[in-house]
Amino acid sequence: MLENEIRQVFSEHPDIIYGFTDISYSPYRESYHSALVFAVPYGEQLTPDDYTEERFEQGIQTAKGRLETIVAEIEQILQKNRVKYWIPPVAQQNETELRALFSFKTAAARAGIGWFGKNDVIITERYGPRVRLSAILIDEIFAYGQPYTEGRCPEDCTECIEICPCKALKNQQWTIGKDRSEIIDYRKCNRMRSAFIQKLGRKTACGLCLAACPFGRPGQKSRTDKD
């Protein structure tokens, strides 16, 4: 069974969070029934005390390497079973809308992997927001996860808000259907990150709002408004 084969891959990588969701909400629903979404933890789970941009970027690259390995394994299974699939690109389409073709974050929330935090990043109970997401659209039906429909960040937690260097975050709790512009000024964030292209040869990774999040910190019990 296809689903069992896919789950077997993740059983060999127990630190990776994964789930399935239907994509009836997506314009790609005419071509694919489902999305497999998974979250690979960064190489280091940095806090503000040990954060540097270089270490954060290295953590992203470490997670990206593992992610690519998993994707290749899943691709082999799908090809063997002659199942139609598509791997959406990570990158945004352009510098105007700053949106990807398929939102990994939306799919992750609907698959039950995590919720949108006040920093507009997916927050997982296990690692907080310090994960790299990927998704594969698959033309099959699976056992779907329980979706998140609202944020679980404590109302009085503002750590990501306060640490943001360009003050792009608006201290708003997420609910399903809320536009991201109500949570974050993405253009302001993007302008700040883009200012480093000449110096670094790329946008700065800037993960301060991820490092500040108390969810998933080693030795710290997560607290939510739902506890």
Positions of predicted regions on the chain:
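Non-catalytic, usually N-terminal nucleic-acid engagement modules in DNA/RNA processing proteins
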Residues: 1-72
